[in-house]
Amino acid sequence: MTEQKRKIEKLAGVKGMNDILPQDAGLWEFFEATVKSLLRAYGYQNIRTPIVEHTQLFTRGIGEVTDIVEKEMYSFTDALNGENLTMRPENTAAVVRAAIEHNMLYDGPKRLWYIGPMFRHERPQRGRYRQFHQVGVEALGFAGPDADAEIIMMCQRLWDDLGLTGIKLEINSLGLAEERAAHRVELIKYLEQHVDVLDEDAKRRLYTNPLRVLDTKNPALQEIAQNAPKLIDFLGDESRAHFEGLQRLLLANNIPFKINPRLVRGLDYYNLTVFEWVTDKLGAQGTVAAGGRYDPLIEQLGGKPTAACGWAMGIERILELLKEEDLAPEQEGVDVYVVHQGEAAREQAFIAAERLRDTGLDVIFHCSADGAPASFKSQMKRADASGAAFAVIFGEEEVANGTAGVKALRGAGQEGEKNVQQTVPVEGLTEFLINAMVASAEDGDD
């Protein structure tokens, strides 16, 4: 090793797995608070499942001939016991697994919601990441179209609560298993007539999962997909009644929708209702929420036959929309930044900061960055940059007199002028600050 210190290489995060920095966290917190309030209003309960599950859960639940299972899962073998494990690419299968394992449905249906990171090994691009976050709902034990309509209505309420516009609803019905089987026969016959122009993905799916060919993103295959036999034409009376019942409920609640016969979703567990909320404001990644009915899944994963429906939405995509439409709320600063000069003042200021926190105020106490006392000027700069409404100042004079200086940093305070310092007795400091903040809020409402 040379005399000169060897340069230590900086480590970067994994591509497609992003840090959420403090300047962005406020928007996440705003969205999370808004959606949690909505979920409570609909009687949903939070469930939290592990990030890692047995790989078999997803191959059996999602379907082996799907993009997620074939190409996108982060799977590995546990070195301790040889188990095949996967970082969850979605969470419906995990919630259903938990409901079965813990016998959650023994006393009736459940409304559950989750939020957290998912993982898919795909090419990172705008709105599509290797680690991404979803919030979702699962209504377990509800069979009627009213449950489908309710979860769709929840999405519309969320867009309204967030102030988002231009998100459009598309719906379809995948019918029942026997109806899909009859459609599959005709669809394969049709696709075989065009096999020469099918791309490799379509050829691979032709006999394993032909329905997914209709969802192709290949521009060269759009006309073929458009003219293919439509599953909706194969629906029996029961499926048709369910789909028409959903449409009536949506219309009764003034929810506009488009029937998209090519909407099939990328997961094998869906039946009957499927839907997507789409926008043209995010480029190619236009789907912000999607879901539907998955009545066969609970039985497929070892439970008793139980109807179910749900949705998931990509949080990153919704936050992109909030920024795009300039709906991101301003970051709120703390209430108070405590400044001090001198050892005795530091101790008094530290005690005062804790007493202010006791009353529920948000307080930053100035701590030295390098162990040396900072100048009054630099501390006040920090106070202003923090977004605090007030600076509370302790110096030798304040300590000697049992007082504190208070400066309004945001035009608040009894004098109504920014940076007008007032002297306040320490015992009356909390009351003074609360009254000043109330007065400032009232002025802001005028």
Curated annotation (Swiss-Prot):
It catalyses: tRNA(His) + L-histidine + ATP = L-histidyl-tRNA(His) + AMP + diphosphate + H(+). PROSITE patterns: AA_TRNA_LIGASE_II. The keyword Oxidoreductase does not apply. GO terms for biological process: histidyl-tRNA aminoacylation. It comes from the Bacteria. Keywords: Aminoacyl-tRNA synthetase, ATP-binding, Cytoplasm, Ligase, Nucleotide-binding, Protein biosynthesis. GO terms for cellular component: cytoplasm. The keyword Membrane does not apply. InterPro entries: aa-tRNA-synth_II, aa-tRNA-synth_II/BPL/LPL, Anticodon-bd, Anticodon-bd_dom_sf, His-tRNA-ligase, HisRS-like_core, HisRS/HisZ, HisRS_anticodon. It holds the Pfam family HGTP_anticodon. One of its GO terms (molecular function) is histidine-tRNA ligase activity. Belongs to the class-II aminoacyl-tRNA synthetase family. HAMAP family: His_tRNA_synth. This is Histidine--tRNA ligase. It comes from Burkholderia vietnamiensis (strain G4 / LMG 22486) (Burkholderia cepacia (strain R1808)). The lineage of its organism: Bacteria, Pseudomonadati, Pseudomonadota, Betaproteobacteria, Burkholderiales.
